[in-house]
Amino acid sequence: WIMGHMVNEIYQIDEFVDLGANSIETDITFDDDAIAEYTYHGVPCDCKRWCTKWENVNDFLHGLQRATTPGNSKYRPELVLVVFDLKTGDLSSSTAYKAGNMFAQKLFIHYWNAGNNGGRAYIVLSIPDIDHYAFISGFREAFKNSDHADLLDKVGYDFSGNDDLSATRNALNKGGVKDREHVWQSDGITNCIGRGLGRVRDAVANRDSSNGYINKVYVWTIEKYVSVRDAFDAGVDGIMTNEPDVIVDVLNESAYSSKFRMATYEDNPWETFKYK
């Protein structure tokens, strides 16, 4: 999965897919009532990027729906996965539940078109703080108490704060997520700073073990050729990047083209792939 980073205006969906992304990451901010408000990152952000692009969340979800609905004039079949980077920093552990519940309702109405031929992309809820596991509980309850519980089949979970893996596993379990139940594990830092791959390798080992909790591992945010090769060598499933075309270039190198390929809609993002 080549994951276009910080896609916060509708026009950027096409921009990043045109560069080779089959996945995008979008920032979500919340108002004082814990309701998702804008697709906005703010400063500081990655080097060589504008930090202040934004849309109203509802408008962005409609644009995303058009890009991921077969038959729509804006449909981009390559775009199969969306990571929502949930800016929960101003939430408390108690308001996190409400925020998750309300965000589920927004997705249901504005992305899934109230269950009637909405967008088809898989969704990953990415939360920076393991103490906000109640966001997941609230999100899941919104669907479990409805006639559309099947939409949870399209939803996965990630904690992005680079916490200890055992603490991350515990937070997922507290949120109601079983081991290997649609779990993506991220590791990374802004592209302005280098970061080693020690925790990435630990996450990959967990993914590949008989008693792990992880389905997929991705690293963020990298675009240097050497860093991309190192990530491939570490066995990641996804790379979040500001320059998808760099990932495509490396993917086409002889050392990697026989081992990796771009994920398509037919590839289940919740299924652990065993590297040979």
Curated annotation (Swiss-Prot):
Its EC number is 4.6.1.-. The active site is at H5, H41 (nucleophile). Binds 1 Mg(2+) ion per subunit. Keywords: Cytolysis, Dermonecrotic toxin, Disulfide bond, Hemolysis, Lipid degradation, Lipid metabolism, Lyase, Magnesium, Metal-binding, Secreted, Toxin. It catalyses: an N-(acyl)-sphingosylphosphocholine = an N-(acyl)-sphingosyl-1,3-cyclic phosphate + choline; an N-(acyl)-sphingosylphosphoethanolamine = an N-(acyl)-sphingosyl-1,3-cyclic phosphate + ethanolamine; a 1-acyl-sn-glycero-3-phosphocholine = a 1-acyl-sn-glycero-2,3-cyclic phosphate + choline; a 1-acyl-sn-glycero-3-phosphoethanolamine = a 1-acyl-sn-glycero-2,3-cyclic phosphate + ethanolamine. It is an enzyme of class 4 (lyase). GO terms for biological process: killing of cells of another organism; lipid catabolic process. It comes from the Eukaryota. The keyword Cell membrane does not apply. It is found in: Secreted. GO terms for cellular component: extracellular region. One of its GO terms (molecular function) is toxin activity. Expressed by the venom gland. Mg(2+) binds at E25, D27, D85. Its main location: secreted. Belongs to the arthropod phospholipase D family. Class II subfamily. Dermonecrotic toxins cleave the phosphodiester linkage between the phosphate and headgroup of certain phospholipids (sphingolipid and lysolipid substrates), forming an alcohol (often choline) and a cyclic phosphate. This toxin acts on sphingomyelin (SM). It may also act on ceramide phosphoethanolamine (CPE), lysophosphatidylcholine (LPC) and lysophosphatidylethanolamine (LPE), but not on lysophosphatidylserine (LPS), and lysophosphatidylglycerol (LPG). It acts by transphosphatidylation, releasing exclusively cyclic phosphate products as second products. This is Dermonecrotic toxin LlSicTox-alphaIV3.
